[in-house]
């Protein structure tokens, strides 16, 4: 389409080509064309000015209305969030106070634990000394028992010898009695022989008297007869009679002397024999008495030693019983104190874990509030930048705390680059945490809820009758599977408990089917615990799913944002004494956009700096970590905690706020 100046130039060119013009005419025509062109430009400018004024009036009206709406919304939101921030600050103050109190209690409990440990060490030292003393006493007792057994064996030997000696003494006493009896018989025979000798002497005297009487009578008769005989033969008869008498007397005297000698010889021989037998018996009896006396002396000494050893043994046994009783009392006291302290430590750990969970929930709430406040701040800053309004003091302070990367992309009246969203990709990853305190461990948990696999890691069979598997998915109802009463898991064997919906075959003892449940359940936080028959948790495995939302853009600023995200994420893990919490993704439930990242402050959390509005990538990870207060021993804060990350979305300002957004 030709303009008026072009049409005029065409006409003038045609006229000039038809008729030649003078220079003055040409000059005037050019001036006329210039004036017409200026008039056309002025008319166009006036029309443009009028349209711009009309548009400006409409825009001013819209700005006024928008300012009124924004002022009303900002005032309401400011009041609401100031109240919420006040409550959050109070909650954080109370949590900080509670944490300080718990730290003081923890330090106190640790001091008590150290004291109890020192006392326990001392008691163990005393116990070791008592055990050493007990061993010495047992060795002494064994030596005394050996000496006692030796003394008893000697006593038995001496008793045997005493019994033999008593038998010999009895025999000797019997022989002595026999010898005494023989001596008495010999004495009786001697007396009898003496009596007989006396009788024979008396008889001999009597016979002598009789013979003398007879001799006198014979003499008298012979004398009488000799009177009658003649005197010649009287001498002959007298001599014959004297010879006969002398011969008879000599014979009688020889017989008596011979009988006396024989009797004396027999008596002296028997008396010598009896005396020798008595001497031998007296010697044997003396020796037996001496041996018996020595045996009695030895028996008395051994009995005294035995009684002394028995007294020492009784004293040692009494002392040993006292030591065992005191040792048992000390063990019971130590065991009771240790049980009480362990129970107190378990209660303290449970309270600490409960306080830590509450503190974690409060920090989650705080981080969500910080993200919402940051999102509102981004919206307000975007509107202020679009409308070229003066920033509020809060925005200035917020920009003053921003990182250098955000300052470079937002400062100096730079123009925000337009971005075009091409595609959105979500990635899910699982993190696992397992704990085992017995022989059986939870080896594998299916992400889709098809099965749970257990393994016996020991070298012994494990009876699992009436054991339970408890499955918890977030706030969903608890699922409980109970093993058969006679089920036993062999050493090194694996058992898989299938859900009914998995289509597996029931094949004990390696494959069990839970017919009452179609699935074990699936979700973002799956906790599987193995409970024994006494109700104690012996194994646990927790499966946490993290969803990462990644948006691909046309702009080349995505690499810068990813680089910034990587640097901030890596810098947060430099301290080896930090414990990271488990990963989460915060997404808007209505608009589908990830929540913006907040610059969380405080003693408990560490997050990355703010992201510039000109960045194109919307996948941002905010990692919160806790610094360990105590040592690395059991019962510290970081034992049962895992990483927690917040995956945030696009931080660029929106041109229009979404309606009914749960985050906004």
Curated annotation (Swiss-Prot):
Effect ascribed to mutating residue 392 to A: Impaired disassembly of the nuclear envelope during mitosis. Decreased localization to the nucleoplasm during interphase
SMART domains: Filament (SM01391)
Per UniProt, location of the Glycyl lysine isopeptide (Lys-Gly) (interchain with G-Cter in SUMO) cross-link in this chain: 201
Compartment list: Nucleus lamina; Nucleus envelope; Nucleus, Nucleoplasm; Nucleus matrix
Phenotype when changing residue 60 to G: In CMD1A and FPLD2; interacts with itself and with wild-type LMNA and LMNB1; no decrease in the stability compared with wild-type
Effect of residue 419 to C: Found in patients with lipodystrophy; no effect on nuclear lamin A localization; no effect on the interaction with SYNE2
PROSITE patterns according to UniProt: IF_ROD_1 (PS00226), IF_ROD_2 (PS51842), LTD (PS51841)
Pfam families, A to Z: Filament, LTD
Lipid-acceptor residues (S-farnesyl cysteine): 661
Region of interest (Coil 2), residue spans: 243-383
Phenotype for residue 371 to K: In EDMD2; dramatically aberrant localization with decreased nuclear rim staining and formation of intranuclear foci; distribution of endogenous LMNA, LMNB1 and LMNB2 are altered in cells expressing this mutant; causes an increased loss of endogenous EMD from the nuclear envelope; interacts with itself and with wild-type LMNA and LMNB1; no decrease in the stability compared with wild-type
GO biological process, one term: protein import into nucleus
Record protein name field: Prelamin-A/C
Record organism: Homo sapiens (Human)
Gene name for this UniProt entry: LMNA
């Amino acid at each position: 389409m030709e303009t008026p100046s072009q049409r005029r130039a065409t006409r003038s060119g045609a006229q000039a080509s038809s008729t030649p013009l003078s220079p003055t005419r040409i000059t005037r025509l050019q001036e006329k064309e210039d004036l017409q062109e200026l008039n056309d430009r002025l008319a166009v400018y006036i029309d443009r000015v009028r349209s711009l004024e009309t548009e400006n009036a409409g825009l001013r009206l819209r700005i006024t209305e928008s300012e009124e709406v924004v002022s009303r919304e900002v005032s309401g939101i400011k009041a609401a969030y100031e109240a919420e921030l006040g409550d959050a600050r109070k909650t954080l103050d109370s949590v900080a106070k509670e944490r300080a109190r718990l730290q003081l209690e923890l330090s106190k409990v640790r001091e008590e634990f150290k004291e109890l440990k020192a006392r326990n060490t001392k008691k163990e030292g005393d116990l070791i000394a008592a055990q050493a003393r007990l061993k010495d006493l047992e060795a002494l007792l064994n030596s005394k028992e050996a000496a006692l057994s030796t003394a008893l064996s000697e006593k038995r030997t001496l008793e045997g010898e005493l019994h033999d000696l008593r038998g010999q003494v009895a025999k000797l006493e019997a022989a002595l009695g026999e010898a005494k009896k023989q001596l008495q018989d010999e004495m009786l025979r001697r007396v009898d022989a003496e009596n007989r000798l006396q009788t024979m002497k008396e008889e001999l005297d009597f016979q002598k008297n009789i013979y003398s009487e007879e001799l006198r009578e014979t003499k008298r008769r012979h004398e009488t007869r000799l009177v009658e005989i003649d005197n010649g033969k009287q001498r002959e008869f007298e001599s014959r009679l004297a010879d006969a008498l002398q011969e008879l007397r000599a014979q009688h005297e020889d017989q008596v002397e011979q009988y006396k000698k024989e009797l004396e010889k027999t008596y002296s021989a028997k008396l010598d024999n009896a005396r020798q037998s008595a001497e031998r018996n007296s010697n044997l009896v003396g020796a037996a008495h001496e041996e018996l006396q020595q045996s009695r002396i030895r028996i008395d000494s051994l009995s005294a030693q035995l009684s002394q050893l028995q007294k020492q043994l009784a004293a040692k046994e009494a002392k040993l019983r006292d030591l065992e009783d005191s040792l048992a009392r000390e063990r019971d006291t130590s065991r009771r104190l240790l049980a009480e302290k362990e129970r107190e430590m378990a209660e303290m750990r449970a309270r600490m874990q409960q306080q830590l969970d509450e503190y974690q929930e409060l920090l989650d709430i705080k981080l969500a509030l910080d993200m919402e406040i940051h999102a509102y701040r981004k919206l307000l800053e975007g509107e202020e930048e679009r409308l070229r309004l003066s920033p509020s003091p809060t925005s200035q302070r917020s920009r003053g705390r921003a990182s250098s990367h955000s300052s470079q992309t937002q400062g100096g009246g730079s123009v925000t680059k337009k971005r075009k969203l091409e595609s959105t990709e979500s990635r899910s990853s699982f993190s696992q945490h397992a704990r085992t305190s017995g022989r059986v461990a939870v080896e594998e948990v299916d992400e889709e809820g098809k099965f749970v696999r257990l393994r016996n890691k020991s070298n012994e069979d494990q009876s699992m009758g009436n054991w339970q598997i408890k499955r918890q998915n977030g706030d969903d109802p608890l699922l409980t599977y109970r093993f058969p009463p006679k089920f036993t898991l062999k050493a090194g064997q694996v058992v898989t408990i299938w859900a009914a919906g998995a289509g597996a075959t029931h094949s004990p003892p390696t494959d069990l089917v839970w017919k009452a449940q179609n699935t074990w359940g699936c979700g973002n936080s799956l906790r599987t615990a193995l409970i024994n028959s006494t109700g104690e948790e012996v194994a646990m495995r927790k499966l946490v799913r993290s969803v990462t939302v990644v948006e691909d853009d046309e702009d080349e600023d995505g690499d810068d944002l990813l680089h910034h995200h990587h640097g901030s994420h890596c810098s947060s893990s430099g301290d080896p004494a930090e414990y990271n919490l488990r990963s989460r993704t915060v997404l808007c439930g209505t608009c589908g956009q990830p929540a913006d990242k907040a610059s969380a402050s405080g003693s408990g959390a560490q997050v990355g700096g703010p992201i510039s509005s000109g960045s194109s990538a919307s996948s941002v990870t905010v990692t919160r970590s806790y610094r360990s207060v105590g040592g690395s021993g059991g019962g510290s804060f970081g034992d049962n905690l895992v990483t927690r990350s917040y995956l945030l979305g696009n931080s660029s300002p929106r041109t229009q706020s979404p309606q009914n957004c749960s985050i906004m």
